[in-house]
């Protein structure tokens, strides 16, 4: 999240993370960076490398999407890098045969997470967040009276077989106050 401190209406001030239940977990990687590479042909996977020595690819699953590849259309360069916090992957195949993937929720504080703690109400699929959970890049608490910008990134680097990559699905953001 970001407060427009300089008042220019642009997201060019300091970004803050909203801490969640796994922020301080031993398995959480702070200062994580992953770089994605534009595929050179339609139907090809999106390759990635990270700053932990890892690499892999986002599989192209034509049965679920009809775009040429999963590299974002709004990115004009052949690579783009995301920086932030990486959570431990919790997904697993309960069948042992690759046919029944489970993605358990995190305790609280993450988008597209079905924790009862995060829900706006008992019947909603919406998640709620509090800017009182804002932290800086070093994990220190930050007091923000309000925010002007929201950026949402998937905090997990994992695949779930035929479901594909674990990714955040967000349909909108609104103020609950």
Please report, for each region that a protein language model flagged, where it lies by residue.
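Extracellular Ig-like/FN3 beta-sandwich strand-entry sites
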Residues: 144-149
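Low-complexity, serine/threonine/proline-enriched polar segments
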Residues: 10-13, 21-122
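A Trp-anchored, charged/polar loop motif used as the substrate-binding/catalytic surface
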Residues: 121-141
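Internal, well-ordered interaction modules that form the hydrophobic cores of assembly/scaffold domains
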Residues: 2-7, 15, 21-24, 150
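Generic detector of ordered, mature protein regions
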Residues: 28-31, 138, 160-165
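Aromatic, loop-rich ligand-recognition surfaces of beta-strand-rich domains
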Residues: 1-12, 160-177
């Amino acid at each position: 999240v970001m407060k427009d401190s300089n008042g220019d209406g642009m997201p060019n001030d300091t970004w803050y993370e909203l801490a969640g239940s796994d922020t301080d977990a031993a398995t959480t990687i702070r200062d994580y960076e992953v770089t994605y590479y534009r595929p050179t042909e339609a139907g090809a996977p999106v390759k990635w490398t990270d700053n932990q020595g890892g690499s892999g690819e986002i599989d192209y699953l034509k049965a679920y999407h009809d775009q040429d590849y999963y590299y974002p259309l709004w990115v004009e360069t052949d690579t783009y890098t995301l920086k932030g916090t990486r959570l431990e992957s919790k997904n697993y195949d309960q069948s042992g045969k690759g046919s029944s993937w489970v993605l358990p929720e995190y305790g609280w504080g993450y988008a597209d997470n079905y924790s009862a703690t995060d829900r706006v109400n008992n019947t909603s699929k919406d998640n709620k967040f509090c800017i009182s959970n804002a932290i800086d890049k070093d994990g220190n608490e930050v007091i923000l009276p309000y925010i002007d910008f929201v950026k949402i990134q998937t905090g997990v680097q994992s695949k779930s077989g035929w479901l594909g990559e674990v990714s955040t699905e967000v349909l909108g953001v609104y103020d609950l106050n």
